[in-house]
Amino acid sequence: MRHRKSGRQLNRNSSHRKAMFSNMACSLVRHEIIKTTVPKAKELRRVVEPLITLAKTDSVANRRLAFARTRDNEVVAKLFTELGPRFAQRAGGYTRILKCGFRTGDKAPMAYIELVDRPEVEAAAE
């Protein structure tokens, strides 16, 4: 029975899940928008939102905690210099999930997960 067991298994063992969500969190922080399946996006929220909350108060201890969870100095620097100050006035809800159809190979439901208040990129086609 799976009573009171939170989180999705996603047909992976625990170390694979941990590595996958660490990599996805780094990609989301670096690019501010990524495309993935809907269940992975919903689980990724549970990893990224605490990281951004941690980055709102800049301290050595918080930077070490963020590095322990991401293992990437570039991502930690962006978290504490850009994202922490950007979301300083927002109490949670830093990500948005936008459904975008189905994958061609297996019809898996796909979604974009992005950081809210993301700076808009000017279209080069104009």
Swiss-Prot record:
Domain of life of the organism encoding this protein: Bacteria
Name of the protein in question: Large ribosomal subunit protein bL17
Keywords annotated in UniProt: Ribonucleoprotein, Ribosomal protein
Keyword NAD: no
Gene3D superfamilies: Ribosomal protein L17
Stored Pfam families: Ribosomal_L17
A GO molecular function held by the record: structural constituent of ribosome
Quaternary context: Part of the 50S ribosomal subunit. Contacts protein L32.
InterPro entries named in the record: Ribosomal_bL17, Ribosomal_bL17_CS, Ribosomal_bL17_sf
GO terms under biological process: translation
Any one Gene Ontology cellular component term annotated for this protein: cytosolic large ribosomal subunit
Protein family per UniProt: Belongs to the bacterial ribosomal protein bL17 family.
